[in-house]
Amino acid sequence: MQKDSNIKDAERTGTISLPVVRANPFGENISAEKAYRRAERIAAAIYILTRHVSDSDTLKSRARESSHILLHDVLGLRSGFRMESGSDAISSIHARVREMISTVQLLSVAGYSSKENTGMVTRALEELSQFVDSASTTTLSERTVFTREDLLIDQASV
């Protein structure tokens, strides 16, 4: 397969690794933090997926803009999933995920993304949406932290 020297090909890596960030606007809201980390990885994947697309192509700018808005929407969950603002944020996240899935599929139709990459990003978006849904159904998801010791059976008491 001949490569065009003007097209940058993303380096193949096992995972999308992002630098560790110590700033945590989520406090004790573990689920929102996990959702945000997922959204960060999706945004990074979108940037990699669109790296070789011309800057003048609206699909590139739209996909990247949507990933920024998704990050903003997930950041809105920091005050909680069940509060009135959390409900609005969840609705926005679901709408944004659906729009991003459509945009990623258009990238595939336009020949900018392989079927495999399109499928992976689509699944990651769907899983983010499902995670937000499941996290919104219980307060345990936001505030409860289990340690390894909490889950181990005390052998002395058995």
Feature-to-residue mapping (PLM):
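Amphipathic alpha-helical assembly/interaction segments
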Residues: 1-158
